[in-house]
Amino acid sequence: MKVAIVGASGAVGRELLKVLEQRNFPADELLLFGSERSAGRVYPFRGKQIGVRLLAHNDDFKGVDVAFVSAGAGTSKEFAETITKHGALMIDNSSAFRMDEDVPLVVPEVNPEDALNAPRRIIANPNCTTIQMVVALNALEKLSHIRRVHVATYQSASGAGAQGMAELEEQHAALAKGGEPRVEKFAYQLAYNLIPHIDVFTDNDYTKEEMKMYHETRKIMHSDIAVSATCVRVPVMRAHSESIWVETERPISPEEARDAFASVSYTHLRA
């Protein structure tokens, strides 16, 4: 299988490179793509050094079977046709196509069958907070239909990418020296702070991040679930956490819920 990673130098791209190697993904050939800033960089993969190519509108994706794209919504929209025109399956990590009717939004533990219907050769990856929530919700949905969800998220600096993590680190260093921290990636200073403001506010006074959880959850689960989210940025480098309140049509006992969660792949029940 010929595999490509677009955005290979970003935080997600570098992590994906590690995961493909750790899980022995069947990639006979791997191509890395990036912007002018990252083109020419070299990364190790299975004992080889692979250089980053400049992403351009050409035929570099000819023969590629799967392209993992994590370079932002603008790049995904601009290069989708270039990536897929020779038959490559584009798995997109951005918000560019998530709500398009002809693009499946897939979490493998929840709706893998949706991936089989991808007429544009694009599969969208949901927002990070949506993914971890729907895996848990799906276990409960199998017991009783979920009516509504209230969720509070606590999201690390990694959600803002490598630049976000770097800014948090710089802020801690500046404050330790009595200096003024630089604030660019976040709405406010993140170090020693909590920011209930991720992305821009929409007309209904929820942030765009919060509305992603509403719309994406309903699409993934093919459900009319009502979702109210409060998304908070917290001053840690990695790991998101969520506190979720769920109302179901029939009462579910704690024992039923524990058994349901225990049966879900890639989850660890602590109860």
Give names to the regions the model predicted.
Residues 66-68:
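N-terminal Rossmann-like NAD(P) cofactor-binding module of classical short-chain dehydrogenase/reductase
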Residues 71-80:
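Beta-loop-alpha module in the N-terminal Rossmann-like domain of NAD(P)-dependent dehydrogenases
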Residues 22-63:
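Conserved N-terminal Rossmann-fold NAD(P) cofactor-binding segment
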